[in-house]
Amino acid sequence: RLLELFELDELEDRDNVTMREDELEEVLKGMLDYAYEKGILKENSVVYRDLFDTKIMGLLMPRPSEVIRHFHELYEQVSPEAATDYYYKLSRDSDYIRRYRICKDMKWVAPTKYGDLDITINLSKPEKDPKAIAAAKLAKQSGYPKCLLCRENEGYAGRVNHPARQNHRIIPVTINGSQWGFQYSPYVYYNEHCIVFNSQHVPMKIEHATFCKLFDFVKQFPH
């Protein structure tokens, strides 16, 4: 499938291939540069490169059903923490969480009279270039996915005004008798920053059931 993506019929010079371990960022950079040189990647800006490298990683990802099955196997046979550790590592190794950008974030603790205050400045979200901004303005408005969090994002190819998510996997969970989705945030405002979202698009509100759901989630994932 990678050959198809890069419009190749076969591997060239297979006998002289050497194996080495490089950081994922460098590997993807080389692939993106090649794609641009060959005219496969039409624009060499961060928005279009992000769309394309997510497509690359999506080809290497296990199917959603495989991820869910392995998560539940670890949860039941080992521990809830083992399950979330596996899922978090997958989210990082798949480049869904871009570690090389997250490390640019600024974080510090400021003492106040009310106690220590954790402060984070997120620098990992890429800035859109002028061409991408212009393309986003001209792009047909779409209501799909309905938001940046809903389950329809899983596997979505993305566009100039919506991030690609082919490398994204969601874990279904039942909370307080209703269906929810568990995922990690790609921007990691704090360690293992996770998100739990309703399977249905309903208004967000704080009520008695909200606290029942919170306690049910903590009961399932006590670590």
PLM feature spans:
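Active-site microenvironments that recognize anionic phosphate/pyrophosphate groups
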Residues: R1-I206
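Long, well-ordered alpha-helical scaffolding segments within enzyme catalytic domains
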Residues: I206-P222
